[in-house]
Amino acid sequence: MAESGKEKIKWTTTIIISSSLKSYEVATALENRSHKVRYSDSVENGSIIFSLSGVAFLLMDTKECLLSTEEIFLAKIEKFINIHQNSFLVLSAALHGPEEWKLMFRIQQRFLGCNLRILPVHNTVNAINLMCTIAKTTSKPYIDSICYRMITAKAYIIEQSPVWKTLQKIKLNSDSVNPN
């Protein structure tokens, strides 16, 4: 299948999933995408780790967070971010109403300045798409390509920018007046 002159290559990677998620839809969905899924009892319950990309996701249901004590789920999140440098909290709710947004705000306040990013999702498909997109864009061949394209775009913008050209003319004119 060709797409704009290039063949589209299916991205697959190895994913370490907490054994607590083995019977959940999210694990099945990742397996169905042809990823190499490994289950582990040694990772935090509810975690999904894309080891080649260096990203980790902690899946939590907002209802469960709201029903449990704040100290319990905050301790779980803290343990997770202390282990994983590039961490995401995936908060799932069918509808993100006022209570769910208050919960996210409390978590953001508690972990302000930490390496935790919060992803509100509505369903499994939404969660899988977000996790795979983040993992794919942070994996080695893709991140190199993205960096190259950003550098190229920056160079093009600088080269074609009328503001940049005006600044260069001003600098050239000031250099001819000022002999230093």
Swiss-Prot record:
Task: Please state where this protein is localized.
Answer: Chromosome
Q: Tell me, in one coarse class, where this protein mainly resides.
A: nucleus
Its cellular-component GO annotations read: chromosome
Q: Name one GO biological process term.
A: reciprocal meiotic recombination
Q: What does the UniProt keyword field contain?
A: Chromosome, Meiosis
Source organism superkingdom: Eukaryota
Q: Which PANTHER family match?
A: HYPOTHETICAL PROTEIN LOC689986, PROTEIN SPO16 HOMOLOG
Q: What is this protein's function per UniProt? A: Plays a key role in reinforcing the integrity of the central element of the synaptonemal complex (SC) thereby stabilizing SC, ensuring progression of meiotic prophase I in male and female germ cells. Promotes homologous recombination and crossing-over in meiotic prophase I via its association with SHOC1. Required for the localization of TEX11 and MSH4 to recombination intermediates.
Known partners and oligomeric status: Homooligomer. Interacts with SHOC, SYCP1 and SYCE3.
Q: Report what the protein is called.
A: Protein SPO16 homolog
